[in-house]
Amino acid sequence: MEKKNSVGIIETKYFTFAQAPNQLVLESGEKLGPITLAYETYGALNTERSNAVLLLHALSGDAHVAGIHKGEQGSGWWDSMVGPGKAFDTEKYFVICSNILGGCQGSTGPSSTNPKTSKPYALDFPLVSIGDMVECQRHLIDYLGIKKLLAVVGGSMGGMQALAWLVRYPARIKSAIPIATAVRHSPQQIAFDEVGRQAIMADPAWHEGNYYTGPGPAKGLAVARMIGHITYMSDTSMAEKFGRQKRNKVRPFKFTADFEVEGYLQYRGDNFVKRFDANSYLYITKAMDNFDASDGKPLHEVLKGTEAKVLVVAFKSDWLYPAYQSKEIAKACKLAGLQATYCEINSTYGHDAFLLEAKGETHLIKHFLKKVFYEYEVTGTYEI
């Protein structure tokens, strides 16, 4: 059953480029091709092609941001934000979302077939960067015939991509909305990612990445997800959701999941294994750790001359991407002379707030996009 203001049934599309001999040259210097991106679109592109918004997903996300797939249960990962009358109003904007390079939800990644061997790439897949992901998105935007995006928007790793767009292609965007993200990872953020990677690689079923004919490192990937999920929540949200409540049905074993929070983490880990590739987890987290929006330089110096408007959003209880990192982004934008706004939402959900605080985000984003789009709405003209 479709929800109120839903975009309805959505079909995933595929775009393939970088065919030999024109493979994509990655930041590492290696070449990769052909490359396929899975993507979805919502709403309609206007005559001037001026109303396109690119949504950028986080680590475990995909192209399916809103609506439902035929014959499947559950809506897209940001369904509360995309649709008629919502933050990204599909009666006004043309919304695009693609699965990243290195992913496992339809886009080329480690689990894809290597044309040279006719087997999955596994660890023969080259290391990719956030910049490489954005470069692939730029090819998709060109394919769709869009010269300038109204906005690039994303939370967490999606926010990193938004910053990469702002730095790499400032002339191709009117605005950017980085949410709950950072210019670069802190040592603590890198440490959490490394523990997750080690959990996967310590699983005997990982087989140095060559597990595609077998069961795969399910235990290791589940543990990695459990670690990650702890960082997505806050102490307050865990206390409110679980407290120290014991489970009703406990298996007769000394170290079973006695507490509700233990059972919940195991459930999240086991479900994640069903839809995500372990090697993709390794590659994507490494790309996040290596990301530096300003390449070691002061961000405000890199952004000088940029005309895009920026809305930076953070959440008070987010300890994975604490608010000070978002404040650094906003400060750099203002020092560079950009029109930048910083907003901190008082939420108890932790890092997950960027997916859950739809009401607060909708209020901010609706007004911001209306302001950015004001020239076109009032005059009917748009500079590209």
Protein language model annotation of sequence segments:
Residues R172, P178-N271:
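Alpha/beta-hydrolase-fold enzymes
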Residues E40, A44-N114:
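N-terminal cap/lid subdomain of alpha/beta-hydrolase-fold enzymes
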Residues M1-L55, H69, Y382-I384:
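Catalytic-loop region of hydrolases
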Residues K148-Q188:
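Conserved hydrolase catalytic core segment
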Residues K334-I384:
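Catalytic active-site module of serine/aspartate enzymes centered on a nucleophile-bearing elbow/loop
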